Amino acid sequence: MIRIGHGFDVHAFGEKRPLIIGGVTIPYHTGFIAHSDGDVALHALTDALLGAAALGDIGKLFPDTDQQYKNIDSRKLLIEAYRQVQTKGYQISNIDITIIAQAPKMRPHIDNMRQLIANDLNCDIDQINIKATTTEKLGFTGRGEGIACEAVALLSKKTV
């Protein structure tokens, strides 16, 4: 059996903190306003994985009202979510992530993002695709007010 999940996340810029996307710290003059580290790529991916396994969403599993998740590294959330997906007997077939940002440029960081995600999910880097696009200066991402991200995860039942 195969299952597909879709995730979406968005965060506004506005805090003097590191900008972390896909687990990678990206040099930029500002970071995200967020309860956790604000990693839009990992949040969207976590939602996609949870959705594919019918386990709800990131807010259900890691509510932003819980102080234990304040400023947490989103890689920890991703790893825990995937552990729960695995308990239902699923494994990753492939992941596709689209980062929507006018700036900063993502291309120099995508290979590092892919490798970190592959390591965290114990899968091959060829199962992880990440791409970036702009909105041609339209909307909040185009005005440089924040970044959005979509992720799709395809899961398959583990074979013994």
UniProtKB/Swiss-Prot annotation:
GO biological process: isopentenyl diphosphate biosynthetic process, methylerythritol 4-phosphate pathway; terpenoid biosynthetic process
Documented EC number(s): 4.6.1.12
Keywords: Isoprene biosynthesis, Lyase, Metal-binding
Binding site for 4-CDP-2-C-methyl-D-erythritol 2-phosphate: 9-11, 35-36, 57-59, 62-66, 133-136, 140, 143
Site keyed Transition state stabilizer: positions: H35, T134
Pfam families documented for this protein: YgbB
Pathway assigned in UniProt: Isoprenoid biosynthesis; isopentenyl diphosphate biosynthesis via DXP pathway; isopentenyl diphosphate from 1-deoxy-D-xylulose 5-phosphate: step 4/6
Disulphide bridges, residue numbers: none
Oligomeric form and interacting partners: Homotrimer.
Cited PANTHER family: 2-C-METHYL-D-ERYTHRITOL 2,4-CYCLODIPHOSPHATE SYNTHASE, CHLOROPLASTIC (PTHR43181:SF1)
Name of the molecule in the record: 2-C-methyl-D-erythritol 2,4-cyclodiphosphate synthase
Organism: Haemophilus ducreyi (strain 35000HP / ATCC 700724)
Organism lineage string: Bacteria, Pseudomonadati, Pseudomonadota, Gammaproteobacteria, Pasteurellales
